[in-house]
């Protein structure tokens, strides 16, 4: 299904003259959008201006392909009335996102772009007709609702500056509008898109990537940066992402994390600790965290790098105090962190579905026995990275361009050669030294 975001990427800055008259007018932009979506377009047969699309909507056939809506989402077609100083001849454009203060961002032609080309402009909602038009093909797409409550079993995604500023398409692909958005890192870095990401999703929280190691004073400075740059949408949860830069002093690391969380709590938010289980066990006394902030753990642990839209419970990284589980980094093709809620906002009791772990999960040094079969009936067994690791292209290699895999990642082992294991595919160019692999059932 074609999406608005794809159309925007293709069209912004370009001009389209569909009827061959008067150059790239606003109607031509609307008609081109319809053609892109595979839909017929309505003509302006009364006044000759865009207002006819709305005023003749019951006669021109547009309602056969579009639904009338009162609350706009990205990709809806908006028709503007005759308003002096704003849209003096009426206008048609595509809603992009909320701009605040009674204005929206609209993608359209003949609104100031060179030679009438598509551009984004801020126009008051007061100039629009009471309803907009949403392509019926968008009917099953998720929409921003401002519902940020969390129930057990809900899904959410977490995003950073690696994702697009407009999360509409990302949320549609993931099947949820609920997000946790990266705001800051260390003491200087700020995302350039966290506000727009919040505007185009239903944020349940925001996160900061910590670099303070075991320095409690630095942790408090990082918390101050985070708190002073939050998006305007209100949330309950603020997260410290602590998965790197730990010091050798486990107690100092723990104190620093708690110092950060104390700052969050004193500002009126619910603090959450995010990391991977192996990193946490090696560097943090997490029992002290949950003693002060019960059920405040958001843990990451993946079975593999295949697309996963729902969790495989036999791979849950069991530990105390877990509220959310990031069960995959590939929630959609191309990569996207996806999470499941284990504890509702008002709950303190977590129930994990009981799954009998198969005997085949035991780690063996040979592939002769107790293996599993993949979809091609090729035997493999499963193991876990004991530390962050850069995989090699072949045994004993020293590649310049290496793929990074995080500690705690589960991998499939297909072949073993002289102390090296080929992982993830029987013909892959991914090799790990055996002494960095541990029994997956022990993690």
Swiss-Prot record:
Active site as annotated: 26 (nucleophile), 91 (increases nucleophilicity of active site cys)
For whether the record's keyword set contains Metal-binding, the answer is: no
> How does acidity or alkalinity (pH) affect activity?
Optimum pH is 5.5-6.0.
Superkingdom per UniProt: Viruses
In chain numbering, where does the site feature Important for 1,4-N-acetylmuramidase activity fall?
A: 158, 185
* SH3b domain segment(s): 380-441
Q: Where is this region: Acm domain?
A: 145-344
Q: Which CDD domains did the record assign?
A: GH25_Cpl1-like
Activity control mechanisms: Ca++ enhances the activity of the enzyme.
In its keyword annotation, does this UniProt entry include Protease? yes
Substituting residue 26 to S results in: No effect on glycosidase activity; complete loss of endopeptidase activity
Q: Which Pfam families match?
A: Glyco_hydro_25
Effect of altering residue 158 to A? Almost 90% loss of glycosidase activity; no effect on endopeptidase activity
Where does the Peptidase C51 domain lie?
Answer: 1-131
* Catalytic activity annotation: Hydrolysis of (1->4)-beta-linkages between N-acetylmuramic acid and N-acetyl-D-glucosamine residues in a peptidoglycan and between N-acetyl-D-glucosamine residues in chitodextrins
- Enumerate the UniProt keywords alphabetically: Antimicrobial, Bacteriolytic enzyme, Glycosidase, Hydrolase, Multifunctional enzyme, Protease
- Gene3D superfamilies hit by this protein: endopeptidase domain like (from Nostoc punctiforme), Glycosidases
List the molecular function annotations (GO) for this entry. Answer: lysozyme activity; peptidoglycan endopeptidase activity
Known EC number: 3.4.22.-, 3.2.1.17
Would you identify the family this protein belongs to, as annotated? Belongs to the glycosyl hydrolase 25 family.
Q: What does this protein do?
A: The endopeptidase activity cleaves the bacterial peptidoglycan between D-alanine and L-alanine. The N-acetyl-muramidase activity cleaves between N-acetylmuramic acid and N-acetylglucosamine bonds.
Q: What is known of its domains?
A: A CHAP domain is present at the N-terminus and is associated with the endopeptidase activity. The CHAP domain is responsible for nearly all the cell lysis activity. An Acm glycosidase domain is located in the central part of the protein and is associated with the muramidase activity. The Acm domain seems to require the SH3b domain for activity.
Can you name this protein? D-alanyl-L-alanine endopeptidase
Q: Which organism is this entry from?
A: Streptococcus phage B30
